[in-house]
């Protein structure tokens, strides 16, 4: 998978470059940002041609991975709608492995048989008490990517469990490093973005700097890129603990993408907070992000 991944990455980059030069991949939408300053595409409905992308990716014999954590009875209640909707809308027509991280044995919901989909239920060790959910999540994720996920899939997404897919989440989202734009902060002035502003924290971004504010609900890319994020996150958290500082997962995520620019950004359509009114820029909500008491 490692050698295959490198070849796939090179061919993907070449193909997308050709599409860009041919003005096929990115269509114009004047009401939203469709390309970043570092030339990464921002994916909105109407900015891509799925038929062209499908024609390419169906020839690549690729496997997608989707990881979700449901490690308590509280989170477990959201798992059924997540899996039911993901099995319908996440990468339809492609091989998908769902990695479901739980803290106890779990019976999967009844779903229609799909020979392209498989499920791995991975029990999180309870040998130690985790006081920080995100620290646990990234530690466990890093372990499983190293041990087996990187050999099993070509692209990997990690998502929050309190999400419901409403439209196709397809191959237009694939890239080396994928970040999700925050549904609220995308429509706000960059001077107000809630980065970590304390210089003592490893998540620190100085005033006047920063590109976008990214949501922690979705991160994706090729496995080694997701693994790199988990390593950098854990390194930053440990450094802050040693210095007596405490920041948040989302702020560490934003610092990572500030230093390591994502190669593709997903518009707020791919993680829309259901408590917000839908603006005219959002044509279709691909994935609805619900508060943890609304499902």
Indicate residue ranges for each PLM-predicted region.
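N-terminal anchoring/stem segment of glycosyltransferases
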Residues: 2-133, 144-151, 294
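Structural signal for hydrophobic/aromatic residues that build the beta-strand cores
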Residues: 66, 86, 98, 141, ...
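Short coil/turn segments at secondary-structure boundaries
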Residues: 79-83, 111-115, 135-136, 169-172, ...
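Short, polar loop motifs at secondary-structure junctions
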Residues: 101-107, 162-163, 270-271
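A conserved donor-nucleotide-binding helix/loop in the catalytic core
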Residues: 125-158, 246-257
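GT-A fold catalytic core of metal-dependent nucleotide-sugar glycosyltransferases
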Residues: 138-189
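Acidic, glycine-rich loop-and-strand cores that form catalytic or ligand-binding grooves
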Residues: 169, 180-193, 216-232
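Catalytic core and acceptor-binding pocket of nucleotide-sugar-dependent glycosyltransferases
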Residues: 201-292
